[in-house]
Amino acid sequence: EYWYRLARVESRLNNSNKVIIAHYKKALEEGRNISSYYAPMSALQIGLIYEKIDAFEHAEFYLDICLAMSGFDYERGIHQQAKASLDRMSD
């Protein structure tokens, strides 16, 4: 949870995408086998950052990771956001 929260704060402070992504990746790695939403939300946020900077291949990779996860709080909403991002990139 620490890395996820840190990345969220850094994102709101408009810190470097590189730093934000690195912290989301740590949250993703540490949370993969835990049933909380931090790991899938981290994958989603990484995907959204990559979408925003037009790095669509990287975005799709992380959005697919997000969609492959299940059994966590807010799953439906997080998956809807990931699918919407993939739809935007396919247009």
How should these model regions be labeled?
Residues 14-15, 54:
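Residue-level detector of the short coil/turn that links helix A to helix B
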Residues 19-20, 59:
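Single-residue signature of alpha-solenoid repeat helices
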